Swiss-Prot record:
Listed EC numbers: 3.1.3.89
Signal peptide, first to last residue: none
Lineage, broadest ranks: Bacteria, Pseudomonadati, Pseudomonadota, Gammaproteobacteria, Enterobacterales
Subunit structure of this chain's protein: Homodimer.
Subcellular location per the Swiss-Prot or TrEMBL entry: Cytoplasm
Short name of any one Pfam family annotated for the protein: YfbR-like
Site keyed Appears to be important in orienting the phosphate for catalysis: positions: 18
Residue ranges of domain HD in the record: 30-142
Listed GO CC annotations: cytoplasm
Family: Belongs to the 5DNU family.
CDD domains: HDc (cd00077)
Protein name: 5'-deoxynucleotidase YfbR
Organism, as annotated: Escherichia coli O1:K1 / APEC
GO molecular function, one term: nucleotide binding
Keywords: Cytoplasm, Hydrolase, Metal-binding, Nucleotide-binding
Gene that this sequence comes from: yfbR
Length: 199
């Protein structure tokens, strides 16, 4: 049986730090970011279905979010100001991402590729799926800013402002619900979020 390097590559996502040009109180890697995005995307999909008449597969959304940055194991995490410096760079980077996504799919044993390709290749996402994952991705970046600012790191002030504009552009009913119900707790200390539920 032929060996595959697919999961050995994915395990290296934990070695790629996000926010590489920013001073961080706590470094965040792509692996842990992907898990948080998967949890938030799943929540957004569940909220959409339960509260706002949606009909999306919340489990699939979680899987798409889990793999949404997988290609960065081959490309690295390009800082946002560089990635979107101009439309030409953004377009070229998208092409590089597409090549990296295909390279990852090609690492998967052939008999499993039809399972993993639709998770890794973002061109297989529906518009609704893509929107939910992008909302979750932006929300998690925003939450990172809140955590850094709460720790006294003003380096993230401008990033927070930019992400607020991104969130406004991607705004949805499910995002509004998430922002109202879950986000305020990120401004609180461990003692404050623990006082209502002692062990």
């Amino acid at each position: 049986m032929k060996q595959s390097h697919f999961f050995a590559h994915l395990s290296r996502l934990k070695l790629i730090n996000r926010w590489p040009l920013m001073r961080n109180v706590r470094t965040e890697n792509v692996s842990e970011h992907s898990l948080q995005v998967a949890m938030v995307a799943h929540a957004l999909a569940a909220i959409k279905n339960r509260k706002f008449g949606g009909n999306v597969n919340a489990e699939r959304i979680a899987l798409l979010a889990m793999y949404h940055d997988a290609s960065e194991v081959l490309t690295g995490d390009l800082p946002t100001p560089v990635k979107y410096f101009n439309s030409q760079i953004a377009q070229e980077y998208k092409a590089i991402e597409k090549i990296a996504q295909q390279k990852l799919v090609d690492m998967v044993p052939e008999e499993l590729q039809d399972i993993f390709a639709p998770l890794i290749d973002e061109h297989a996402y529906s518009d609704e799926e893509k929107s939910l994952v992008k909302q979750a991705d932006a929300l998690c970046a925003y939450l990172k800013c809140l955590e850094e600012l709460a720790a006294g790191n003003n380096e993230f002030l401008l990033a927070k402002t930019r992400l607020e504009a991104t969130l406004e552009a991607r705004r949805s009913q499910e995002m509004d619900y998430f922002m109202e119900v879950f986000v305020p707790s990120f401004h609180l200390s461990l003692d404050e979020i623990s006082q209502d539920s002692p062990l």
